[in-house]
Curated annotation (Swiss-Prot):
Record's protein name: Phosphopantetheine adenylyltransferase
Record-listed E.C. numbers: 2.7.7.3
Self-association and partners: Homohexamer.
Cofactor(s), by name: Mg(2+)
Entries under NCBIfam families matching the protein: coaD_prev_kdtB (TIGR01510), cyt_tran_rel (TIGR00125)
A Pfam family matched in the record: CTP_transf_like
UniProt-listed GO biological process terms: coenzyme A biosynthetic process
Coiled coil: none
Organism: Xanthomonas campestris pv. campestris (strain ATCC 33913 / DSM 3586 / NCPPB 528 / LMG 568 / P 25)
Residue sites binding substrate per the record: 14, 46, 78, 92
């Protein structure tokens, strides 16, 4: 089957929160495609620290320098979102070998659901290979400094979450 539109890529994730690793991947993908759509998944089952709207805002702020990058929230099956965006490429990041098994399984499932779309894996720059949103959330929740892992706007957002939970 032919590729839908190989000039448009979707980079999906929960982005709870967006990290410097995510930003690095978009920075490297943006020159490769005419259009990159960062799809921020609703994912209520993951119990996100930040609401979908706030995660979209933070990603938009972090990626504003790219004219060909847009950020959109979605609450549908990823395959439907990719088709709705007219994308021919699904971007995924691989931080370590430990990510591979899960990502391979997801790529195989997506190949069945959207056979016209290719999954492309990018590895992070070495200085970002250990960063994950879950680690950033945990460090922030415990009052640690996450400024080396996320943009300043995300540091502020996580601090607000921590302070609001402390008042409860």
């Amino acid at each position: 089957m032919s590729v839908a539109n190989s000039r448009t890529a979707v980079y999906p994730g929960t982005f709870d929160p967006i990290t410097n690793g995510h930003i690095d991947l978009v920075n490297r993908a943006a020159p490769l495609f005419e259009r990159v759509v960062v799809g921020v998944a609703y994912s209520p089952s993951k119990g996100p620290a930040l609401p979908l709207e706030r995660r979209v805002e933070l990603a938009q702020e972090a990626l504003a320098a790219h004219a060909n990058v847009e950020v959109r929230g979605f609450d549908t099956l990823l395959a439907h979102f990719v088709r709705d965006m007219g994308a021919g490429v699904l971007l995924r990041g691989l931080r370590a070998v430990s990510d591979f098994e899960y990502e391979f399984q997801m790529a195989s499932m997506n190949r069945h659901l959207i056979p016209e779309v290719e999954t492309l894996f990018l590895t992070p720059a070495e200085q970002y290979s250990f960063i994950s949103s879950s680690l950033v959330r945990e460090i922030a929740r415990l009052g640690g400094d996450v400024s080396g892992f996320v943009p300043a706007s995300v540091v502020d957002a996580l601090r607000q979450v921590r302070e609001s939970r402390a008042q409860v």
